[in-house]
A protein has these predicted regions:
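N-terminal secretory signal peptides that target proteins for export/translocation
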Residues: 1-3
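Detector for small/aliphatic-rich hydrophobic stretches
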Residues: 6-9, 21-201
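Non-catalytic interaction/Regulatory regions outside core domains
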Residues: 8-11, 37, 45, 49-71, ...
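Non-catalytic, conformational "gating/processing" segments within enzyme and secreted inhibitor domains
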Residues: 104-105, 143-309, 331-415
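Feature captures eukaryotic membrane-trafficking machinery centered on endolysosomal pathways
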Residues: 106-130, 292-294, 417-448
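Short Gly/aromatic-enriched secondary-structure transition segments
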Residues: 133-137, 251-258, 316-324
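Internal alpha/beta scaffold segment
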Residues: 308-332
């Protein structure tokens, strides 16, 4: 008889919960809307190029590298830097699938939270199951390399900027009749700093214990993530990412006014629109114009807000995002008149189908899943549920976001430039740590 792993994830900015199993169709995940594109008013976003005698655009590296104290760098090996690029590809691939599932709805997700849960699963996986997980993550690396990369972010990202609060937490909860393999348990504790607990899944107190952990690690933004446990459930893996930061330059609340926001279908609503003029970085290409809004000290964390170019939509933006294209963006200085809504978004996403479509269907298949490295006394189990809950709040002060991801295994029988950036229509946003390049959150806001 096979039993199941349940995976859950959450974060303060967004909460991610993995709690399900399933397969996915073979439809291509392009993120394109099924309905014809709607035309709606376009805000001008014309930027004057800064003076540059070399004729070349300036990358963020050359602009700020001398300004950043090295003690605050996230120190990665060359192999780990390569994993960041692969991880960002995974982030955009996953978000493309999430957006395609409901492209007209605001959402938020933490791909990193999902990656941590998959990384923990990978330590217990064997054979083709391990191969699929590695391919989905895009790493193609050894388990050791993946573990060390995850540990580097857990150890260093929270202290990259003392003025920013970041917490990454992991939980491994085993049903009381499951004996975890020593190597698996050690990896969970040494590389993922995971709390490892043995619980009686037949008791409500175990559900309460895990939900209390979820609430605490998400700063109260996600009160619970597990509805119930079954005695047939074998293991619960949880990841939580909590992020809270103030803008480097705050918006003046007195400048916030109700203004028109035009949705993708052409309908309009009134939203509180924050406003300020600032010297910031921006980039532009044929699909979108983006601005770089820094948090904290201004040198580590930022939210990049992406607004479609004329004739484009956020679906086009999501479709265009890849690790390579993202890395190749050039950010220049400009003095920008910024308007963007004060907003909050919550997401509750079942990830089984999406992870299956991305290339790891066997982890949800009772006949094909191989997690024999987790426990010798329970060789046959599979992932029954993968779910992510996430939440984000953006206001004049800054941003608070969290995500929780859960996996459950269950039994089966610019100085010289000027411009305007008015986010009065749907947009995409990305929260990223600069020195590592790691993407922590991706979302869209569509006025709902």
């Amino acid at each position: 008889m096979k039993r199941a792993i349940k995976l859950f994830g959450f974060s303060l900015m967004m909460t991610i919960l993995f709690v399900g199993c399933g397969t996915s169709s073979d439809d291509e995940l392009t993120g394109n809307p099924k309905n014809p594109k709607k035309e709606y008013p376009q805000t001008p976003m014309h930027f004057t190029e800064p003076n540059d005698t070399s004729g070349k655009k300036t990358s963020p590296d050359s602009m700020v590298i001398d300004m950043l104290p090295k003690t605050q760098y996230i120190e990665l090996t060359q192999e780990q830097k390569a994993l960041v690029a692969k991880s960002n590809d995974f982030s955009f691939n996953l978000y493309r699938a999430i957006h395609a599932a409901d492209h007209q709805k605001s959402n938020i997700t933490s791909p990193l939270s999902v990656a941590y849960v998959l990384g923990m699963l990978n330590d217990g996986a064997n054979g083709n199951t391990a191969k699929e997980i590695s391919q989905v993550l895009g790493f193609g690396a050894t388990k050791q390399a993946i573990n060390e990369y995850c540990k580097a972010l857990i150890d260093q990202a929270p202290i990259a900027d003392p003025s920013v609060i970041l917490q990454i937490a992991n939980m491994v909860a085993a049903n009381q009749d499951v004996t975890l393999e020593k190597d698996f348990k050690n990896d969970m504790q040494n590389y993922y700093s995971a709390e490892v607990a043995s619980l009686d899944f037949s008791k409500q107190s175990s559900v309460d214990y895990l939900n209390t952990w979820c609430k605490e690690k998400s700063g109260g933004m996600i009160p619970s993530i597990i509805d119930a446990l079954s005695p047939e459930d074998l293991l619960v893996l949880m990841n939580a990412v909590y992020f809270k930061a103030t803008w480097t330059e705050k918006f003046d609340e007195k400048e916030t006014q109700e203004e028109v926001f035009t949705k993708a279908d052409g309908s309009t609503i009134k939203l509180p629109m924050m406003h300020r003029n600032a010297q910031i970085r921006y980039c532009t290409n044929e699909v979108y114009t983006g601005i770089w809004l820094p948090f904290g000290s201004g040198d580590r964390w930022s939210m990049k807000v992406l607004l479609p170019e004329e004739g484009k939509t956020i679906d086009d933006i999501v479709k265009s995002l890849t690790g390579e294209s993202w890395e190749n963006n050039y950010w220049q200085h400009a003095i920008v008149d910024i308007k963007m809504p004060r907003f909050s978004t919550k997401s509750d996403i079942m990830l089984n189908d999406m992870v299956s479509k991305l290339g790891a269907p066997s982890i949800f298949d009772p006949q094909k899943a191989d997690f024999s490295l987790i426990s010798k006394n329970q060789k046959q189990f599979y992932v029954s549920q993968m779910k992510q809950k996430a939440a984000i709040e953006v206001n004049e002060e800054g941003t608070k976001t969290t995500a929780v991801t859960v996996s459950m295994m269950t039994g089966s029988n610019i100085v010289n430039g000027k411009g305007e950036f008015h986010a009065n229509r749907p947009f995409v946003y990305v929260i990223q740590e600069w020195s590592s390049g790691a993407i922590f959150f991706i979302g869209t806001f569509q006025g709902n």
